Amino acid sequence: HRIMDGEFYAYAKELKELGVIRHIGMSTHNPAVARLAAESGRIEMILFSINPAFDMLPASENMEDYFKETYDEQLGGIAPERAELYKICEKNNIGITVMKGYAGGRLFSAETSPFGVALTPVQCLHYALTRPGVASVMAGYDTIGHVDAAVAYETAAEEEKDYATVLSKAPAHAYYGQCTYCGHCAPCPAGIDIAMVNKLYDLAVMQPEVPAALKAHYD
C-alpha cells in the first residue's frame, strides 16, 4: 500500500500519461503482495519468481521466513497462495514474467537441487510457461551454450519437457536452507552483502574451477 498509494506509483502513472512509458509493472517474491497488485487494477505485469521448488513454499512477507523456522514437514504440492495468484493473474489479464526460473542454476544438478535429481533447462522453462498467467521467462546466460539450451525448448519433444516425474519425488520442504539472494536479511551489522556473497558462492561451486570473473569481485 505504501507503494501503490505513495509518490512512486504516482510518478510512474504520470510518466505513463505523458507517454514516456507505456506500461506499469512491479517485481516481488511475495505471492500476497503480487495478488494485491493483480487485483488493484493498476498493474499490468508482474515480475515474479517461479520454479518447482519455490512453488512449494508457504506465503510470507519475508523470503527468509521460508526456511528453517517455518517449513512444515507435511507441506506438499504447490502452495495454494501461489496457485491462486497465477489464476488471478490469468483472469485479470495480468502477464507474469518469470524470474528465478532456473533457481540460479541449482536445479540443473542433483547435488544442488532440493529434489535430489537434476532438471533440464527445457523442463524448468516448461514448468514456468505452463503456469496460468505466465507470459514469458527471463533467463540469464553466461555462454552461447546456455542460450542454445534455452532455445531448445522450441523444438523439444513432450517427453523432454516432462517435469512431473521429478516433482513426484519432491520433499515436503523443498527449498529448506537455501538462499534466494532476495536481500531481505539486509542490512548486515558487519556491512557484509550477504545476498551477493551467497550468490558468488553458489556460482563458484557449480564450476570445476572458480571463474576469473568471480575472483575479480574479491580483488
Mark where each language-model region is.
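Glycine/proline-rich, positively charged
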Residues: 1-97
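Structured C-terminal cap/extension of enzyme domains
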Residues: 39-42, 66-219
